[in-house]
Design a protein with these regions (language model features):
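Sequence/fold signature of self-assembling virion shell proteins
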Residues: 214-353
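Long, contiguous amphipathic alpha-helices that act as assembly "spine/axial" helices in icosahedral shell
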Residues: 79-156, 174, 178-203, 326-333
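Extended, solvent-exposed, turn-rich assembly/linker loops in the middle of proteins
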Residues: 148-241, 246
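Assembly/oligomerization interface modules of large self-assembling protein complexes
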Residues: 30-98
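Generic detector of well-ordered alpha-helical segments enriched in charged/polar residues
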Residues: 4, 14-21, 25, 31, ...
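Glycine-rich loops and low-complexity Gly/Arg-rich segments
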Residues: 70-73, 143, 220-225
Length: 353
């Protein structure tokens, strides 16, 4: 097996694969929460979780010429280090393709180009699925092709899979009070105040007949209140009473991409982000909350590939030839892992029965 540089050189293949990835990354909903961040060519990534600061004592006065005892100054810091793992894909141009297009390098180039772009997009899909894992579970688990790795981001137990006092598909529930209580838990654990929510259309629809919200909207008793609120009215009440400024309906965001014929992600989002999920977080545009860390590849630093990247990160692409039988492999390789830096500033509740 050898690198083919005549049909589509690795430098061009790399650009095509990266462009496919970047297109998908730019339109998928969680790319703002976990923006791609270069790991500057290193296989080891690190981040500092939020930990309580030590108490700062008051200094004491003394009389002139009087001695004073020693005090102990304390600092609180911690850094987590974790190794990255490759994210790879391979496609194929078969012997049958070659015999049907003898010496047609233009055909082979175009076919290879399409496959490099598709593999780059597939890398973006994998990253998005793992971002969903990070947000919902507070961890990312990879168990495939010899890799058996779990990245755990330390979300406090009191902020994971929490049930409201009364499930929200019960009209007697009080979502405003539940959210207020959850924010207090987050702050007690040194998390930041949330101003964004990631949930589903089913959760919002369940609240459209909620008695507390109906009376809050009307300012009157149930008898004189609307029996069925609009989604905008539900969202408006949550926004006005809980300091929420942005709500993402995750299930519908992917569905809209599909129905608008923009992009159809081949993934069961409902399995990764169940209908009952309600997540509080600081913002959808907060670069300190998380990132999709992009590490190095062996190919990018191998002179034979002639890729010549200034920084060893992102995807690479290469067309590999086999002589017996004659065919080609389309190879795309990279290193990407989403990291939730501030898990303590996120809260995940299961709000429906």
């Amino acid at each position: 097996m050898a690198i083919d540089k005549t049909i589509i050189p690795p430098s061009e293949a790399t650009e095509v694969a990266q462009a496919g990835h970047d297109y998908v990354n730019g339109i998928l909903p969680l790319s703002n929460i976990f923006p791609v961040k270069s790991n500057e060519g290193s296989w080891i990534t690190s981040w500092t979780p939020v930990i309580p600061k030590s108490k700062t004592r008051a200094m004491k006065h003394r009389a002139l010429d009087a001695e004073i005892g020693h005090t102990k100054s304390e600092t609180s810091t911690a850094e987590i280090h974790s190794g990255l793992i490759p994210l790879s894909g391979m496609d194929h141009i078969s012997e049958r393709d070659l015999t049907s297009h003898v010496n047609d390098t233009s055909y082979l180039h175009d076919k290879a180009e399409g496959k490099f772009e598709a593999l780059g997009q597939q890398a973006g899909v994998t990253e998005e699925i793992e971002r969903l894992q990070a947000l919902v579970l507070g961890k990312v688990t990879v168990k495939e092709n010899g890799a058996d790795v779990q990245y755990s981001f330390g979300r406090p137990t009191a902020q994971q899979n929490v049930a409201p006092t009364v499930k929200w598909d019960d009209n007697k529930s009080n979502p405003v009070k539940d959210i207020e209580a959850w924010v207090k838990i987050m702050r007690k654990n040194y998390g930041r105040k949330p101003h964004a929510v990631a949930t589903t259309g089913k959760v919002i629809d369940a609240l459209r007949t909620n008695e507390f919200l109906r009376t809050q909207l009307s300012g009157m008793d149930l008898e004189h209140s609307k029996t069925y609120l609009s989604r905008d009215e539900v969202l408006g009440l949550l926004i006005s009473q809980n300091g929420i400024t942005d709500v993402l309906l995750v299930d519908e965001a992917y569905e809209d991409l599909k129905l608008d014929n923009t992009f159809n992600m081949d993934a069961d989002v409902a399995t990764v982000f169940p209908d009952k999920t309600f997540i509080l977080l600081p913002s959808f545009n907060d670069s300190t909350l998380g990132a999709t860390v992009s590490g190095p590849t062996a190919e990018a630093q191998n002179s034979e590939y002639e890729i010549n990247k200034k920084v060893n990160d992102g995807l690479i692409g290469a067309m590999l030839t086999h002589q017996a039988p004659l065919n080609y492999d389309i190879w795309v390789n990279g290193t990407f892992v989403p990291i939730l830096f501030e898990a303590v500033s996120t809260f995940k509740a299961d709000v429906l029965a």
